[in-house]
Amino acid sequence: ILIQGESGTQRRTLARAIHNFSRRHHYPFSVLHSPGSDLTEASLLRLLAETNHGTLVLSQVDRFPLSIQDLLVNVLTNVHGNFFSAPETRRFDVRIIAIADDNLYKKVEKGTFLRELFHLLSASELQTVPLRRRREDIPDLLNYFLLQFFHNTDMTCDRIFSEGLLRFLKEYAYPGNIHELYNLSC
């Protein structure tokens, strides 16, 4: 699964929800943040083994160095085979969710992202939408944040925020997306 969208659009929350509402929810949920070029095949295999039957999120995959992308292609295309660092056959059953800020297809065209890895990751694609393009969700998000702040109360944003303030919040640009709305609501 490939999840693309701007920073702050809750891509990792979406990845967690996919995991939590799947048959894999009892198994590990691991995140590999943009690694340096020193990630080894053995380290990646160890992470796959630890996450077996669960979900591995490749966070900011669009920033992975080409050497790591090549390593991922090798590991993902040999999920049921032999590896250089492990002579015995190892079998992994791991859902891979890749998260990217940028349009990966454009990076493929520029030569900064491996075409083969793009095709391996993009069997299913999801695009998160920035808050400025879904302003109608702002009252619901504010209500959700209020529930987080005031557990077990019947407070809603229309009881706390004036109509003028809600109108202002709906018109604001939100360059920080949902994170910025969350911080404003605190």
Mark where each language-model region is:
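Short gly/ser/thr-rich secondary-structure transition/capping motifs
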Residues: 37-40, 77-83
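Conserved catalytic core of Hanks-type protein kinase domains
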Residues: 50, 75, 120
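Structural recognition of the conserved hydrophobic beta-strand(s) that form the central parallel beta-sheet
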Residues: 57-59, 74, 93-101
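Residues immediately C-terminal
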Residues: 63-64, 104
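Post-Walker A connector loop of ABC transporter nucleotide-binding domains
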Residues: 20-21, 74-78
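Hydrophobic/aliphatic anchor position in the core parallel beta-sheet
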Residues: 29, 55, 81, 96-98
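Conserved post-Walker A coupling segment in P-loop NTPases
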Residues: 1-63, 130-135, 184-185
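Nucleotide-binding/hydrolysis machinery
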Residues: 6, 10, 22-26, 70, ...
